[in-house]
C-alpha cells in the first residue's frame, strides 16, 4: 500500500494546485511505465513468466493484456476478458473492486495512476503505436483497452 500512498502524499505536498498535482503525478507514473520494459531482458523475462510462445510476435497487444490480466488476478481483482486478439485486448472490471483493494489510496488517483502507468508501459513493451486507456471510468463497470490509438502527444 505504501508504494502507492507515499508517492501520492509526497507529490500532493509538492504541488501548489490540483492541476499541478495531476501534471506531476502523470509525469511520475508515465516515466515509471516507460522505464518498466526499456531493457530487452525485461521483455523476455515477462514473456517467460507469462509463458508466451515466440510464435506470438513482439508487436502484439496480448503481451500487455496478459500482463494487466495477471496483475489483476494477482491482486484478486475479478476481471473478464472481453477481447483478446492481435488487434485489441479488452478487460472488463468493476470500478469499485478495482479501486477498493487499497484502502489508503484515493480512488481517482488509483485509476489515473494505473491508466498512465500502463499506457506508457505498452509503448516500450509492445510498440509506440499501441496505447492503453480506460473506458467508462465513471460507470459501475469499466473496460481496460489495449489497442491502436493516435496519441497526439506522441506524434
Where is each model-derived feature located?
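N-terminal accessory segment detector
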Residues: 1-90, 97-113, 117, 124, ...
Amino acid at each position: 500500500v505504501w508504494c502507492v500512498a507515499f508517492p501520492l502524499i509526497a507529490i500532493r505536498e509538492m504541488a501548489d494546485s490540483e492541476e499541478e498535482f495531476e501534471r506531476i503525478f502523470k509525469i511520475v507514473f508515465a516515466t515509471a511505465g516507460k522505464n518498466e520494459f526499456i531493457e530487452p531482458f525485461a521483455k523476455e523475462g515477462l514473456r517467460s513468466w507469462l509463458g508466451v510462445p515466440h510464435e506470438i510476435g513482439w508487436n502484439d497487444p496480448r503481451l500487455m493484456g496478459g500482463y494487466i490480466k495477471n496483475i489483476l488476478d494477482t491482486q484478486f481483482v475479478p476481471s473478464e476478458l472481453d477481447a483478446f486478439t492481435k488487434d485489441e485486448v479488452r478487460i472488463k472490471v468493476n470500478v469499485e473492486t478495482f479501486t477498493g483493494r487499497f484502502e489508503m489510496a484515493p480512488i481517482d488517483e488509483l485509476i489515473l495512476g494505473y491508466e498512465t502507468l500502463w499506457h506508457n508501459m505498452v509503448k516500450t513493451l509492445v510498440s509506440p503505436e499501441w496505447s492503453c486507456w480506460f473506458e467508462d471510468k465513471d460507470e459501475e463497470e469499466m473496460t481496460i483497452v489495449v489497442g491502436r490509438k493516435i496519441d497526439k502527444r506522441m506524434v
